[in-house]
Amino acid sequence: MVVPADVNLEDSILISKDFNIDTSVFNEKLLDAKNFSNVKASILINNISKDEYAPIQEKLWKHSGFFVQKKSKRTYNALTAANLLGYISEVNKSEVEKNSYYEIGEMIGRQGLEKTYEDKLRGVKGVKFFQKDKFNRIIGSYKNGDYDTLPIPSKDLTLTIDLDLQQYGDSLMQNKRGSIVAIEPKTGDILALINSPSYDLSSLIDKNRSINYKKLENDSIGKPLFERGLQGQYAPGSTFKIINALIGLQENVINEETMHRCEGGHFYSKNAFMRCHTKETTFSNLNNAIYTSCNTYFAKTYKEIIENYESSSAGLDKWNDYVRSFGFGNYLGYDHPTGQPGFIPSSQYYNNWYNNSWRAVTTISNSIGQGEILATPIQLANFAATIANRGWYITPHFVKEIENDSINDNYKRKNVSLIDSKHFEPIINGMIDVIDIGTATNSKIRDIKIAGKTGTAENFIRVNGKRKQLTDHSIFIGFAPADDPKIAVCVFIENGYWGSRWAAPISSLIIEKYLKKEVNRKWLENYILEGNLNKEYLKPYLTCNFSICLLYTSDAA
């Protein structure tokens, strides 16, 4: 620490040498400290190690205006949840100018829960007043300490995260990119938020934190600082068919027994064909359409929803209202500063795009979760929790308790969707069959009934201005036990082929680990642990042409 008024500037070269700091750096930091306050102490050197402390302490007596002050330092007991917890760093000049609480060199929550709960985690500084003589020497306390205040310790936060589940999820996501979000449906407690790839938080608390941060920031391939579970905006694919089924039931354009004919796909206009999972002619009711993921069924249902109103604009806006009531298209309001709202198109969007000339079939990709629709993994996990609750959700949150304080009332209040509760049971029955006889039979768990839905999202990049297809993303949403849900999950694996290949098995392992505390299906666990998708992630950066996985599966996009 340095008090600028007490420093002999003629000794700056010797001071720099004794404290092992570059003279120009010393002069710059001393000027910053002086600009902040000439008589108040500011930090000169931060994060002094034990090895550095001894030689500095030995030389302090030679230089007035300097002293060593101990301070708390973050330690991390587990190598997990880096983006969730966030990191701290020194306040900048602008922050000091805006908030008189902070002084140059002090730390502030920069990201994650560290930022959201900064005022709880920092505590309150104490103040002690001293009297000085004309030689600027301390001669005692001021007014016998009547104006002194004691520091108030920071408050402990109890997180909703299940550490065992979080770390298990980390292991499953090795050599894969994407996220896992797990929520307790009845409470909105977020049980796990896994981001892959991630990083070691301890690398951002030592002297090299600036260098280490730059390395993370410059990793344009892995993007470890990008919190995919909260920031990743993706097409939800076939998982979105569930919401269109619910809206169809609510709007009375379908019921459980409504049959639709599928001839390997659907001609939604004269020359426009939406392919389905089979080339054979089939007839599906609602249950069958869910567990086989029939594109035709949901395309026809969506078209009838929009055309159930006097105009396409009115129908689309009503559809938009239904979708948003599940938390899509907004930030959800969780207690983390990072996030994206996703995107749910409105009639105004299409009016602007198509100059007021469009119909239901123009927007038919909405029926299968493609096109303009974007959702984040936490929104999809919250959607699964809402289905599990038969139509309502508690705003997801990461903090369960605050020491001697209360959490926000928003994390206790029910948010009710616009779908009547009676419509959820047939949907859930179809989602159970997804696991039992449908697109995710490889993810069954003995003695645990899972309700879920696989999804495959199209994946493209721009190469020299041209759109080039990459291997599709793998998605799964679900909850268990189906009759009394304790956990709702969304797993999103970038470039993971189809939903049943990676996302569904990982989800089932997460569910098994949480409900049974151990995993018995070692064959499946080993398959996931050994799975490596790094070759897929390198393809866009190859100078040669590359191929993608286009295997035709029962899981339609």
Which functions belong to the PLM regions below?
Residues 133-138, 142-148, 186-239, 243-493, ...:
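Beta-lactam-recognizing serine transpeptidase/beta-lactamase-like catalytic domain environment
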Residues 552-557:
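Conserved small/polar residues in nucleotide/adenosyl-binding loops
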Residues 40, 64, 80-83, 153-157, ...:
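Envelope-exposed proteins and targeting segments
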Residues 14-19, 31-154, 491:
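Small/polar-residue-rich segments within soluble enzyme cores
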Residues 111-131, 177-202:
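Carboxylate/His-rich catalytic cores and anion/metal-binding grooves
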Residues 407-415, 506-548:
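Short, gly/Ser/Thr-rich active-site loops of penicillin-recognizing serine hydrolases
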Residues 140-179:
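Conserved, well-ordered alpha-helix/loop/beta-strand core segments that scaffold catalytic motifs
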Residues 1-20:
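Juxtamembrane extramembrane loops of integral membrane proteins
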